[in-house]
């Protein structure tokens, strides 16, 4: 492997190895090609980058801290654990990093309407937020199942002026919401910008979303250099579609000394049919415009994903993750619902931080690994979002446990 090989992708066709690409309807192809051209031009435009930096600083509140989790470190008795505090961003998660970038691009392209899909509602909230800030009408597609379990975020989106379209097709979750958003885009190609929330979809989305999220890893590198004078030994992030993970990982892919771990949602266990671990329990296929690992049945039909966290129950994964899995640069593991909940409670009690259930999957893996590692091992966890949105889920789970007891 040459030194830059891992970070070089995608190629001109949007491929990371054999993953990614542009599998879209004929009507969308000109649009997707146009978006790729516009994005390349924007990346090279100092004015665009200057405006992006302004909003990252004054609107999102970056840089956010790299925080030494002293009590969790003591509790584990091994590696020195740091949290990259994405939950301190405006809107409470990493999602807004990408939304600000894409809305500036939409504005540059003269688009008059935003659409987006959302699962946990955090991308919907971030999209509604930037739509309000830039005075654009906004339609959010959200699975009916997710609307039920994310009432607070639904209300936040409405407060911000977004129209929410409930999707009852399929399981009424993120995959179905994305299908509906793609249908809308095909119908309204002229004036509409589709703001995809993760590192999936047709090229250029996986690379573009990664680039807007890569500020996470860039800041982490500089902050750890300042605190410890060196690179981290390991990075851990949860992976649904995988944008917070790609954001943290990307800057370190060519640093061979840095171990990188992505944590999928193991649900009730990857040996059951109730999980969302596409890499640990899926096979390659095509969904939502790109080739990647997917949860499929023997007939190639997409199966339902399950996770206690609404943001991880997607039956696929970003194509760059699929590539990094195949070339073995990143290790992908899974954490069950119960393990994530235990880590959620531990982080609340030990650090006074209420993490999102998504982030709790990464925390659970860290809690497993840290005790076996030396005290000078530097471990960074991406705390991708805050747990306010998950209160009802955790309350329901605790009530169910009490009943069983």
Curated annotation (Swiss-Prot):
Keyword flag Transferase: no
Known pathway: Amino-acid biosynthesis; L-tryptophan biosynthesis; L-tryptophan from chorismate: step 5/5
Family matches, as InterPro entries: Trp_synth_b_CS (IPR006653), Trp_synth_beta (IPR006654), Trp_synth_beta/beta-like (IPR023026), TrpB-like_PALP (IPR001926), TrpB-like_PALP_sf (IPR036052)
Known EC number: 4.2.1.20
Highest taxon listed in the record's lineage: Bacteria
Reactions performed catalytically: (1S,2R)-1-C-(indol-3-yl)glycerol 3-phosphate + L-serine = D-glyceraldehyde 3-phosphate + L-tryptophan + H2O
Gene3D superfamilies, per the entry: 3.40.50.1100
Any one cellular-component term (Gene Ontology): cytoplasm
Coiled coil: none
Record keywords: Amino-acid biosynthesis, Aromatic amino acid biosynthesis, Lyase, Pyridoxal phosphate, Tryptophan biosynthesis
Keyword Repressor: no
GO molecular function, one term: tryptophan synthase activity
CDD domains named in the record: Trp-synth_B
Modified residues (N6-(pyridoxal phosphate)lysine): 95
Pfam family, one: PALP
Signal sequence segment: none
Cofactor: pyridoxal 5'-phosphate
Role this protein plays: The beta subunit is responsible for the synthesis of L-tryptophan from indole and L-serine.
Database matches in NCBIfam families: trpB
Quaternary structure annotation from Swiss-Prot or TrEMBL: Tetramer of two alpha and two beta chains.
Family recorded in the similarity comment: Belongs to the TrpB family.
Name assigned to this protein: Tryptophan synthase beta chain
Organism: Pseudomonas entomophila (strain L48)
Organism taxonomic ancestry: Bacteria, Pseudomonadati, Pseudomonadota, Gammaproteobacteria, Pseudomonadales
């Amino acid at each position: 492997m040459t030194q830059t090989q891992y970070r070089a992708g995608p190629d001109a066709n949007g491929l990371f190895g054999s993953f990614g690409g542009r599998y879209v309807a004929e009507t969308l192809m000109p649009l997707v090609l146009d978006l790729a051209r516009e994005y390349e031009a924007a990346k090279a435009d100092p004015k665009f980058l200057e405006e992006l930096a302004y909003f990252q600083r004054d609107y999102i509140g970056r840089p956010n801290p790299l925080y030494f989790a002293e009590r969790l470190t003591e509790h584990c008795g091994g590696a020195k654990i740091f949290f990259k505090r994405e939950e301190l961003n405006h809107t409470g998660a990493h999602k807004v990093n990408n939304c600000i970038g894409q809305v500036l691009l939409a504005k540059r392209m003269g688009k008059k309407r935003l659409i987006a899909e959302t699962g946990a509602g955090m991308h919907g909230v971030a999209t509604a937020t930037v739509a309000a800030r830039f005075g654009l009408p906004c339609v959010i597609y959200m699975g009916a199942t997710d609307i039920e379990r994310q009432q607070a975020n639904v209300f936040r989106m409405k407060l911000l002026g977004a129209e929410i379209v409930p999707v009852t097709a399929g399981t009424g979750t993120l995959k179905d919401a994305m299908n509906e958003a793609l249908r809308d885009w095909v119908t309204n190609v002229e004036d509409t910008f589709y703001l995809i929330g993760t590192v999936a979809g047709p090229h250029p989305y996986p690379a573009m979303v990664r680039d807007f999220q890569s500020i996470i890893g860039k800041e982490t590198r500089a902050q750890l250099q300042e605190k410890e004078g060196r690179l981290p030994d390991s990075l851990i992030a949860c992976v649904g579609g995988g944008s917070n993970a790609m954001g943290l990982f990307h800057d370190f892919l060519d640093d061979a000394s840095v171990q990188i771990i992505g944590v999928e949602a193991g649900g009730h266990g990857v040996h059951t049919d109730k999980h969302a671990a596409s890499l640990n329990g899926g096979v390659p296929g095509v969904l939502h415009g790109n080739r990647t690992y997917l949860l499929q049945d023997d007939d190639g039909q997409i199966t339902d994903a399950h996770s206690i966290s609404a943001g991880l129950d997607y039956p696929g994964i970003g194509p760059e993750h699929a590539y990094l899995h195949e070339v073995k640069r990143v290790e992908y593991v899974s954490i069950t619902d119960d393990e994530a909940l235990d880590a959620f409670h531990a982080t609340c009690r030990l650090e006074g931080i209420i993490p999102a259930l998504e982030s709790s999957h990464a925390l659970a893996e860290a809690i497993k690994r840290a005790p076996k590692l030396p005290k000078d091992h530097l471990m960074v966890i991406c705390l991708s979002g805050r747990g306010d949105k998950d209160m009802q889920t955790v309350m329901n789970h605790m009530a169910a446990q009490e009943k069983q007891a």
